[in-house]
Amino acid sequence: MRFTFRLFAVLIIITASGTQALAQDEAKQAQGGGDLRAAVQNPVGAMYSLPFKFTFDYGASNGEASFLNIQPVIPITVGDWNLINRLIVPLIDSPGEVTGLPSIPNPIPGDGATGLGDINYSLFISPAKPKGAIWGIGPSITIPSASDKELGSEKWSAGPTGVILFQPKWGTFGMLARHLGSFAGDSDRKDINQSLFEPFVNYNLPKGWYLISDIIITANWDLDSSDIWTVPLGGGVGKLFKIGSQAINARTEAYYNVVQPDNAPNWQWGFTLQFLFPK
């Protein structure tokens, strides 16, 4: 936990420094900034990026959980198609059994742990030059890589994933969805049967600022009916800026769970720092 907060503080300082650098480079940012912002807001855009996503979950009966997700995006263009490789490598600090967390769908009781969680890989196949709606589909797989059984599912799981979005002049809106079902792993752990729905909207403002709502709704279908759904509501604000020639996207958000299972967090606050490498 202390490591997570120290790294978070370092990234906050980087963001502040970049905002000062942007003030010296506003004219350059204004030129072509819209294209970069559109690419950032497109989950299947053909742009290399390295996001660091911090989330802090509050309100569970046994304490707070925190996550640092390292989420590299590696696009490969093959003819008329983009192959978008997305990896999620979670570092987790958990107080014990906490429900309603997308990355630990079958939590178990314990005294808490800190370390690596289960790694997820998704591949989106998307048209390189879409007309109208932008879309991508492909497989997703979660690997039981957790360093402690409290931080993962101890199950191999896989399933389909897809995204559709639109980018009018004012911003971006769309939906990402994924379903994972377990097919191997520790027989003593509950099976995985989880769907994820992620509606998102970005409203662009001047000088690289934007408003965002990126809601992650989860359904764990094998739980009791009262515990299946976790539904948050909320949003936040973000900004594109540069440090030298390095383009960076930073955003902060807060969400409240209007529907949640027992022993789930009430609130989530997040901060994302995304390093961008346009082709």
Feature names for model-found ranges:
Residues Q24-K279:
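Transmembrane beta-barrel domains of Gram-negative outer membranes and organellar outer membranes
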